[in-house]
Amino acid sequence: MQAKKPIEDLLKELQELYDNPADPVHKDYYSKLALLELCGWLELVIDDIALKYARARIIDPKNVELLEKEIVGKTYGCDYKANFRPMLIKIIGLTNVEQFENKLTTLGVFQILVSQLSSLASLRNPAAHTSIAGVMTTFQAPSTMTNYLNSLHPILTIVESELNAM
């Protein structure tokens, strides 16, 4: 899984800039950047979890290439239902995804994972496809993204561990 410290440090730096902006309008820049950076990091984590699992089990180089280019390589976004789950279904199959989700539910982390990733995706998607210029949009402070990170990181560690245990 991607290291937490670099994104944690970046979010901290963005919060410091947000708290002391050279121009008040820059607060929106730092907030939007924090959101996009956290979601980008989450996409990398999701990809890493899937790739690590699959590479440990797939032997045929053609299937590894298919995995990297067509399954993981064409998955964009950090939403569980729209991005991560379909990728897992292609890699481990629907019945195994069901077992995996049941295990995460038993551990009490599945609904939190789905809810937080969905929440972030609903913030990220419009932010990623619009410009701040001339638009009155407000974004949550970088500290909010740090809270998401601190909540999701241990859950993603469990996700990785439970997936690799299958």
Residue ranges of model-derived segments:
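Short, solvent-exposed segments of well-ordered alpha helices
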Residues: 1, 25-36, 107, 111-118, ...
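Charged alpha-helical initiation segments
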Residues: 1-32
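Hydrophobic/aromatic-lined pockets within catalytic cores
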Residues: 46, 50, 54, 132, ...
